[in-house]
A protein has these predicted regions:
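Ankyrin repeat A-helix N-terminal signature
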Residues: 16-21, 51-58, 86-93, 121-129, ...
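Core solenoid repeat modules with strong leucine/isoleucine-rich periodicity
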Residues: 110, 121, 126, 130-132, ...
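Start-of-repeat signature of ankyrin repeats
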Residues: 10, 44-46, 80, 115, ...
Length: 309
């Protein structure tokens, strides 16, 4: 018969091994004494399952920890952290996150201290697997209607982190009304956020149709329109074309503080020559306009070949 290891040593070691990612040794301790799955670590006052998912553990170890202590899936530490939420934040493997969901689907409806749902967290990480994201959405579709304490819905975060993917479109399909909701800090609509973070023309077009007024809305501090925000270093002609199509007058609008027109911004950021051409054609007089520091668009982009040409 296998003798149990020293219990005090086990209680100290299980969390240390998990933090050091010594998975095989942690598994051995768990097999020798499953009660270690109920011990509290000193670093985060957490159970071993929570400690493990912070460190990208293998699926087999997570399954063993859940089997030894099923309640650990729904147990928060003193900071309010739950294994599923922590696994998503730590970008654990798809298999590990899926195992946590299946062990306790109710956790999908949990909230963090900032008011974020699990779906909010899933929208924060570009590496999130689409099928897994869709599983979270199916378990709680109404999560798309919740906003965190900053006034951000999952759609805002999806536009921030997932513009090149289908996730932002999926969230928009689930709750298109969120396109008409601005955040509480900068009064940005999802259209502003998507424009700034490299959304393609198709997504911008869909956001516009869900709430056309967003294209004329200016952010609180700098007074940027979506077109200003789209004229960044990652701008694509398709995105700028869509924004100009629906609100060509935006090419004539300067920022509240710097007075820069979209052409100033695009020139400064070295945007594609096709983008510069579209902005010029929308407002030819922009070439002569100076911003608050006295620079014309040409002077803003003096270091970029595309502007010189």
């Amino acid at each position: 018969m296998m003798s149990s290891p020293n219990n005090s040593l086990v209680k100290i070691s299980i969390h240390s091994l998990l933090e050091r990612r010594e998975w095989d040794r942690a598994q051995e301790l768990l097999i020798a004494d499953p009660s270690v799955s109920m011990t509290i670590g000193s670093t985060y006052e957490s159970l071993p399952l929570l400690t493990a998912v912070m460190n990208n553990p293998p699926l087999t170890l997570v399954q063993s920890l859940i089997a030894a202590n099923p309640d650990s899936v729904t147990t928060k530490n003193e900071y309010g952290m739950l294994p599923l939420r922590t696994a998503i934040r730590s970008q654990a493997s798809t298999e590990v996150i899926d195992a946590l969901i299946r062990a306790a689907p109710i956790v999908v409806k949990s909230f963090g201290v900032s008011g974020k749902t699990v779906l909010h967290l899933a929208c924060l990480y570009p590496s999130m697997d689409y099928d897994l994201f869709h599983e979270l959405l199916e378990l709680w579709p109404d999560a798309t209607k919740w906003k965190d304490r900053d006034g951000w819905h999952p759609l805002h975060l999806a536009c921030l982190c997932h513009c090149p993917s289908t996730i932002a479109s999926t969230v928009l399909n689930a709750y298109p009304e969120a396109a008409a909701i601005a955040d509480t800090d900068e009064e940005q609509f999802p259209l502003h956020i998507a424009a700034l973070h490299g959304a393609n023309g198709t997504l911008l077009q869909r956001l516009y149709h869900c709430y056309p007024d967003a294209i004329k809305a200016r952010t609180k501090t700098h007074g940027w329109l979506p077109l200003h925000l789209a004229c960044n270093k990652d701008a694509t002609p398709g995105a700028v074309r869509v924004l100009l199509q629906y609100y060509p007058e935006a090419a004539k609008v300067g920022g509240k503080q710097c007075g820069s027109l979209p052409l100033h911004i695009a020139s400064r950021n070295g945007c594609d020559a096709e983008i510069l051409k579209m902005l010029f054609e929308a407002y030819p007089q922009a070439l002569e306009k100076k911003n608050s520091v006295g620079d014309t668009p040409f002077e803003c982009g003096a270091g970029h070949v595309s502007v010189k040409e």
